Every structure is written in structure tokens, then in C-alpha cells.
Amino acid sequence: MRPGTELAAIHPAVEAGVNNQDIDGLVALYAEDASMVLADGTIVTGLSAIREQWSGLLAMNGHMTVRSRYAIATGDLAVLSNEWTFEVDGERMSSVTAEVARRQPEGWLYVVDHPFAGSEPEELAAIAASMGTTDT
């Protein structure tokens, strides 16, 4: 099995993917029809759109720390949450996630990833600005 396909391995795989600049490893954690919520509230769907978002973050060349809060599975669905921190050039951004994963033949994969679920509007504006997005 590839990294991240066991439910408990998803969050460590995200941290490793960011810190090792492994775009392919990050995208491999998502189902083909997965959606991601951006800092400005926009929802993107599909692996190419998710790859583009991760590429933008990786281009910042920062360091990510991920602390898993929970992963609760029932049948073929799971709800997950982590607290992440991303630091680049002395600047720090962080949030709490809301995620849904679905059991696939190849293991657990994200179907919904909301990396900014725990952020207040003011925090989201700052995150969006630091990532080059101003629509919040």
C-alpha cells in the first residue's frame, strides 16, 4: 500500500509531503473526484485543481507541522481533522481542518479537504493574502 492509504497515516503523509516537496505524494492522497476548499472559500474539484493548490503552497518552500485531532470511520466513510501550522520566512499561518475520506480499493483517500475550517474570517483574509489571493 502506498503511504497515506491507512486512515491513521493520512495526516503524517500530508506533513511529509509538504516538507519533502512531494507533490505527487500529496495528490495521491485524494480521490479523483475530491474537492478542496481554498482560503477564500472557493471550492476546487479534481486532481489537477488540487495539484495546482498544493503546487502553490510548495512554491512557498515552508515547513509544515500537522497534529492529528481525530479520524473517525464508519463503513467506507471517515471524518478527520488536524491542526496544521505552516511557517515560511518567519511568518506563521495555522488552522484546523475538516476532512472526509472514503475507503477505496487502494485505501483511504480524501474526498473533501477543508484546510481552513477552523479559521475566523480575519485569519482567512491574512492567509489568503499570504497565498496571493485577496478575495475573502
Q: What residues fall within each predicted segment?
A:
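A beta-strand edge to alpha-helix "cap/lid" segment located at domain peripheries
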Residues: 1-25, 35-136
